Swiss-Prot record:
The lineage of its organism: Bacteria, Pseudomonadati, Pseudomonadota, Alphaproteobacteria, Hyphomicrobiales. Keywords: ATP-binding, Glycerol metabolism, Kinase, Nucleotide-binding, Transferase. It comes from Brucella canis (strain ATCC 23365 / NCTC 10854 / RM-666). It is an enzyme of class 2 (transferase). ADP binds at T12, R16, T265, G308, G411. Gene3D superfamilies: 3.30.420.40. Disulfide bonds: none annotated. This is Glycerol kinase. PROSITE patterns: FGGY_KINASES_1, FGGY_KINASES_2. GO terms for cellular component: cytosol.
Length: 498
């Protein structure tokens, strides 16, 4: 049986390759971690060649596990860590520097300089993003300013810039394709999301030559054919999306007003706003959710820095649990009469506060506070931060209502207790899918639908399966009191008034 779909999920700490059959069942999986480099405080880098090797390795593992050959694969879909920046030689394919990862903060001072020049409104108007080191544009500017001779080579078209998807497509096609998709382009700080083009004015401000930029395609498109020297056959690459946008697709959030939230180390929530390119007044990001058949669908995005990382903190630094899976059972034992708040601003606060200098704190401690109360506070902090995002989205866009259903994925959502508390605090239903690997599923659907093997959007949405719906059950007075306590706690951690 042919018609298998290969989905590559290139993440921040590991690479996974997953094979799906025609019935959307997983038949093979390869996973491999790779090295994290920290050359200086606040700097994070990856070896792009090591990432490429991990992709090749995991593909071979997945094929072997499935017991099929590459000739049985009908199409490839790719999803990737967003914003991470690679520059490589157009002829040799060799990177000129290690990839600068999305977490890297080396361009913070440069971003501050641009803000002092009052340029943030211009960048936000065109890209939907904020002037922050998080995004690719200032990382690329740093490389052009610090790698000897790179600017001249870029002006001559001798080097290529790309996010990880672009780098992998270049390598998979044997250097024949220098392309990206609209979702990854929308995270670079140099792409006009309203006009769907690289923006000359922003390129000029950052000093980036247009000759080094990839062609931007729809998320489901012909991105090129794999080099037959790699796997013995040429396989079409037909789908690409950044990881959070791929999760929107994998959760079948195709209608305006649908929202997904991914809970891993941090949390990323995206709200589908349809063709409305909403400008946030609450410092949320406006981004491209996906572009299909030439039609751009937008989203509001909010990011939380600390979600599952709060549980890791309880385990690794506090020693309250030995494994992360213990935390829910421990939280259930907490004294309901104690109201403890953990504001997990270990690395500042993300949306909608964007306070990099804020630091974590715990409020409400009594002599009776113990491990169980800490566990509950850590899990509740995720719910409260998600509430902050949803409230900001409702303030920005009329389509976000109290009837919004949140579809969730990521490691934390396996906990029934956490999901119920999330529904209670949001006062909104929370849907957990049967298949939790929605990011890689989204990449697979893009490729499979383009190949005509899997159903279209409507058919895929109908096949999306819910494992459980968590309905809000907390009395309104209790909920309002809990949220008031959270707001008071956050206000004490902020370094500037909101």
């Amino acid at each position: 049986m042919s018609g298998y779909i290969l989905a590559i999920d290139q993440g921040t700490t590991s690479t996974r390759s997953m094979l799906f059959d025609r019935n959307m069942r997983v038949v093979g999986l390869g996973q491999q971690e790779f090295t994290q480099h920290f050359p200086s405080s606040g700097w994070v880098e990856h070896d792009a060649e090591e990432i490429w090797k991990s992709v090749q390795s995991t593909i071979r593992i997945a094929l072997a596990q499935a017991g099929i050959s590459a000739a049985d694969v009908a199409a490839i879909g790719i999803t990737n860590q967003r914003e991470t920046t690679v520059v490589w030689d157009r002829i040799s394919g060799k990177p000129v520097h290690r990839a600068i990862v999305w977490q890297d903060r080396r361009t913070a001072q440069f971003c501050d300089e641009l803000k002092r020049r009052n340029l943030e409104p211009l960048f936000t108007e065109k890209t939907g993003l904020l002037l922050d080191p998080y995004f690719s544009g200032t990382k690329l500017a740093w490389l052009l300013n610090h790698v000897p001779g790179l600017r001249e080579r870029a002006q001559k078209g001798q080097v290529c810039f790309g996010t990880i998807d672009s780098w992998l497509i270049y390598k998979l096609t044997g250097g024949k394709a220098h392309v990206t998709d609209a979702t990854n382009a929308s995270r670079t700080l140099i792409y006009h999301i309203g006009e769907n083009r690289w923006d000359d004015e922003l390129l000029d401000i950052l000093g980036i030559p247009a000759a080094m930029l990839p062609e931007v395609k729809d998320c489901a498109a012909d991105f090129g054919m794999t080099d037959p020297a790699l796997f013995g056959v040429s396989i079409p690459i037909l789908g690409v999306a950044g990881d959070q946008q791929a999760a929107v697709i994998g959760n079948a959030c195709f209608e305006p007003g649908m929202m997904k939230s991914t809970y891993g180390t941090g949390c990323f929530a995206l709200l589908n706003t349809g063709t409305d390119r909403v400008t946030s007044s609450n410092r949320l990001l406006t981004t491209i959710a996906y572009r299909l058949d030439g039609v751009t669908t937008y989203a509001l995005e909010g990011s939380i820095f600390i979600a599952g990382a709060a549980v890791q903190w309880l385990r690794d630094e506090m020693g309250f649990i030995s494994v992360a899976s213990e935390v829910s059972a421990l939280a259930e034992k907490a004294d309901p009469n104690q109201r403890i708040y953990l504001v997990p601003a270990f690395t500042g606060l993300g949306a909608p506060y964007w306070d990099a200098e804020a630091r974590g704190a715990i409020f409400g401690l009594t002599r009776g506070t113990g491990r169980a109360e800490f566990a509950r506070a850590a899990l509740e902090s995720v719910a409260y931060q998600t509430f902050d995002l949803l409230e900001a989205m409702q303030g920005d866009w009329k389509g976000a209502t109290n009837h919004t259903v949140l579809r969730v994925d990521g490691g934390m959502v396996a906990s029934d207790w956490t999901m119920q508390r999330l529904a209670d605090i949001l006062n909104a239903p929370v849907d957990r899918p049967v298949f939790l690997e929605t990011t890689v599923l989204g990449a697979a659907w893009l490729a499979a639908s383009r190949a005509g093997i899997w159903p279209d959007r409507k058919g895929f949405s109908e096949r999306w399966q819910r494992d459980c719906r968590f309905e809000p059950a907390m009395p309104e007075k209790e909920r309002e009191s809990a949220i008031a306590g959270w707001r008071d706690s956050v206000s004490r951690c902020l370094t500037r008034p909101q």
